[in-house]
């Protein structure tokens, strides 16, 4: 288990100096496990430069106007040195550069942090992707230099690993080029980033994995649905992060071995069974379907919390089972068994 914290949001509130004074992000939240921080690049750029309404997309069904914001609507502007952006909290102006991102993340004190990168969409032009990739390459070099300086300066602090981020959208030549370029740099591991069309995700991750050093870990950024985790594992990814477990919880969706279902449905109003009978999480061992149904319809924030606890437990437990099946040599049997049941149940939900 690990937690990935958002450098952009922690920078704005409560501020990296407070987290640093608390002993780092793990100490600040009393979390005993490993921690990651992202670079802030995705959130900054999603304010307008890269994304308008959506990120997780199927390129065949999403229109450019749904993704690329008009210049006047943008809350962030990118140049070769960094990004200037307007806070979504109070409208104040801020500037992120590769060096500043490293400074913020060193103060946040996570075990693993990511280099500052420009995250593009599937709908940016090829020429823009080429220019963006070169910008990300140069930013990666600047991140490494600043990371090394800060590591020396803060030598009394625990070492923080730095991962480079591979971009290139849906283009094989750009993905492979990025993996070769960053793979030759002195990173501790690599994140595979950018908007990924689900239909081509496995192929893209495989392109990247074939070019990266075999002895360094690969993290698949923003991927966390059960089917996608299996695809990522088979394509060479080692770790994952995603907000989907909490995002779907806010819409009353519940993960189960029989697929995803919605606890707000009327059939759960008088069901006093556990939320998911086979689950050992805090929510399922303490509360009934009827109670969660009530919380959702009463618009109680507790509903989001309890459903998030369950959904996170479900995904973390799934990854543990995948790991065990790989160790025992029964991965494909486990995959078929899980997806056959999950897919059938989801179709009925």
Q: What is each stretch, according to the model?
A:
Residues 1-155, 266-269:
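Non-catalytic, usually N-terminal nucleic-acid engagement modules in DNA/RNA processing proteins
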Residues 3, 38, 105, 164, ...:
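Conserved, mostly hydrophobic/aromatic
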Residues 9-11, 42-43, 120-121, 169-171, ...:
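Short, solvent-exposed loop/turn segments at secondary-structure junctions
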Residues 16-25, 249-263, 316-319:
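C-terminal helical cap(s) of enzyme catalytic domains, especially alpha/beta-barrels
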Residues 100, 104, 131-142, 177, ...:
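A non-catalytic, amphipathic alpha-helix used as a structural packing/dimerization or gating element
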Residues 117-123, 276-349:
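C-terminal extensions of enzymes
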Residues 121-126, 130, 188-193, 301-304:
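Glycine- and acidic
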Residues 134-137, 146, 150-152, 157-275, ...:
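Glycine-rich phosphate/ribose-binding loops and adjacent secondary-structure elements
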